């Protein structure tokens, strides 16, 4: 199965990608991870990307697409893969098609913005051991202190409500249109995010016919 995962930041794509990857025995391809690997391994496209990163510039789409195609040509992708975080825009999706990358299904995990903001802004990270707690779903025992090491709990900049809202705005403007893109090709499957990871996994497996 060749799968693209869609959904807003905080929808749980990474978690579900890991679960599906184990169940289907196919790799999860995360753009950030393969970009770092390509640069570290010094592949031709990786070296090109490195020149942009080192000069503080955004890596252009054609280089990102090149790195993705390079990774998908590896033997472990022969039976399928899960693309997480790629494509992010319609031009990227069109470029993948032009390179002969034909996915089977685009799975969209649906969740309300308000729920995402509540989830992410409720996260607290320990300054000392980097453990993550949540003031609602996994509350700490002592106010402002990590249960594991007693370190100070902080809100990461990425989890601040204004940052989360800004990321959601970008998602709605740039990535959400991909749902129509894949729906027009008869490849979109949508699943509502559930209150628990297990329930969301069950809904995904049912939608994909993996029960």
Place the predicted regions along the sequence by residue.
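Glycine-rich phosphate-binding loop of ATP-dependent small-molecule kinases
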Residues: 1-211
């Amino acid at each position: 199965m060749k799968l693209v995962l869609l959904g807003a930041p905080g929808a749980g794509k990474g978690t579900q990608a890991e679960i599906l990857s184990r169940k289907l025995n196919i790799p999860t391809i995360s753009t950030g991870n393969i970009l770092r690997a390509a640069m570290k391994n010094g592949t031709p496209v990786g070296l090109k990307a490195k020149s942009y990163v080192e000069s503080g510039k955004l890596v252009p789409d054609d280089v990102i697409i090149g790195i993705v195609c390079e990774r998908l040509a590896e033997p472990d992708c022969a039976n399928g893969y899960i693309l997480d975080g790629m494509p992010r825009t319609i031009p990227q999706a069109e470029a993948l098609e032009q390179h002969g990358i034909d996915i089977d299904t685009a799975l969209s995990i649906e969740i309300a913005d308000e729920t995402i903001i509540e989830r992410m802004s409720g996260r607290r990270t320990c300054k000392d051991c980097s453990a993550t707690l949540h003031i609602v779903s996994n509350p700490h025992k002592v106010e402002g202190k990590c249960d594991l090491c007693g370190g100070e709990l902080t809100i990461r900049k990425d989890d601040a409500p204004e940052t989360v809202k800004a990321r959601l705005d970008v998602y709605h403007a740039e990535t959400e249109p991909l749902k129509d893109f894949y729906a027009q090709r008869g490849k979109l499957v949508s699943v509502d995010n559930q209150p628990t990871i297990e329930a969301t996994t069950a809904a995904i497996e049912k939608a994909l016919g993996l029960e």
